[in-house]
Amino acid sequence: MPKQVIIPPGTTAPIAPFVPGTLADGVVYVSGTLPFDKQNNVVHIGDPKAQTRHVLETIRSVIETAGGSMADVTFNSIFITDWTNYAAINEVYAEFFPGDKPARFCIQCGLVKPDALVEIASVAHIGTPT
C-alpha cells in the first residue's frame, strides 16, 4: 500500500518541509508536534499543561483524520525543555491515554521555538481499511 499524506481539515502549512502525518500499511506516523496555532505561533506560553493538551489534541486530529483513535497509539517520542515541567506534562498525557499506555521516551532538549515547552511525535497502528 502506498504512503498516504494525512493533513487534518483546517491545518495550515508547516514551517518546514514536512506534513502532519503519513499513513503506510496501517500505521500512522505523526510528525513532531509543537503547541502552534494556525499561524504557527506558540500558544499557551509558560503553561506546560495547556501546551501539552494542545499538542495531544493536534496529534489526535491527525490520527482521527487517518481513521484511528488515540487508543491506537503504540509509541510516543516526547521532547521537553525543562524537567520541572515533567509532572505537569505527564498529568495531561495520562488524560489522553487512560487505559493501556503506549511505549515512549522523554528527553530534555531545546526546541525550534523558544516559547515551546513540549513537542511530541507519535506512531499509531490503525490497521488496514476494509
Curated annotation (Swiss-Prot):
GO molecular function term, any single one: deaminase activity
Identify the Gene3D superfamilies for this entry. RutC-like
Which PROSITE patterns does the record match to this protein? UPF0076
> Lineage of the source organism?
Bacteria, Pseudomonadati, Pseudomonadota, Gammaproteobacteria, Enterobacterales
Source organism per UniProt: Klebsiella pneumoniae subsp. pneumoniae (strain ATCC 700721 / MGH 78578)
Name of this chain's protein: 3-aminoacrylate deaminase RutC
Q: Which family does it belong to?
A: Belongs to the RutC family.
Q: Which InterPro entries match?
A: RidA_CS, RutC, RutC-like_sf, YjgF/YER057c/UK114
Record's superkingdom? Bacteria
